[in-house]
């Protein structure tokens, strides 16, 4: 079963894969950040948001994974096998947990739309050949100042506010006909 943990939040594993693995802070730093910013909400028995729930689950999952890794480390006698297991957990599972924690902390801190815009911007930037792209990658904390995302919060897009001239013309003859029919009756 291929489950994408970002799907319900409007992102995908592929979208996050554009960010290099060294982009994400350590699990310890991310867990400390989540705790410092959202401890009350994470420990609350009440539901706060899907991001809080996902953060809570990722932190619990990492704790269980560390318990398992410790058990394996203590019970595997072959040092080569032990190292393989520890490296696999840290490299593969660690990266996935770091991505999850970063995504949900960022969504809670900056807003989901801003984070998605950042992921798209970074994806475009990284895929653009170096000769044709700006020297610096987009920065999440400055993104709200430079993107269109803020305009969406203020109101509708211009396309919705102003109907196209075609619509106006096609609606007005119908109105005239219906009004004239009513006046004839």
Swiss-Prot record:
Pfam families: Hepatitis_core (PF00906). SUPFAM superfamilies: Hepatitis B viral capsid (hbcag). The keyword Phosphoprotein applies. The modification Phosphoserine is found at residues 157, 164, 172. Residues 136-185 are annotated as: Disordered. Phosphorylated by host SRPK1, SRPK2, and maybe protein kinase C or GAPDH. Phosphorylation is critical for pregenomic RNA packaging. Protein kinase C phosphorylation is stimulated by HBx protein and may play a role in transport of the viral genome to the nucleus at the late step during the viral replication cycle. One of its GO terms (molecular function) is RNA binding. Keywords: Capsid protein, Cytoplasmic inwards viral transport, DNA-binding, Host cytoplasm, Host-virus interaction, Microtubular inwards viral transport, Phosphoprotein, Repeat, RNA-binding, T=4 icosahedral capsid protein, Viral penetration into host nucleus, Virion, Virus entry into host cell. Residues 179-185 are annotated as: RNA binding. It comes from the Viruses. Sequence repeats lie at residues 157-163, 164-171, 172-179. InterPro entries: Hepatitis_core, Viral_capsid_core_dom_sf_HBV. It is found in: Virion; Host cytoplasm. GO terms for cellular component: host cell; host cell cytoplasm; T=4 icosahedral viral capsid. Belongs to the orthohepadnavirus core antigen family. Self assembles to form an icosahedral capsid. Most capsids appear to be large particles with an icosahedral symmetry of T=4 and consist of 240 copies of capsid protein, though a fraction forms smaller T=3 particles consisting of 180 capsid proteins. Entering capsids are transported along microtubules to the nucleus. Phosphorylation of the capsid is thought to induce exposure of nuclear localization signal in the C-terminal portion of the capsid protein that allows binding to the nuclear pore complex via the importin (karyopherin-) alpha and beta. Homodimerizes, then multimerizes. Interacts with cytosol exposed regions of viral L glycoprotein present in the reticulum-to-Golgi compartment. Interacts with human FLNB. Phosphorylated form interacts with host importin alpha; this interaction depends on the exposure of the NLS, which itself depends upon genome maturation and/or phosphorylation of the capsid protein. Interacts with host NUP153. This is Capsid protein. It comes from Hepatitis B virus genotype A1 subtype adw (isolate Philippines/pFDW294/1988) (HBV-A).
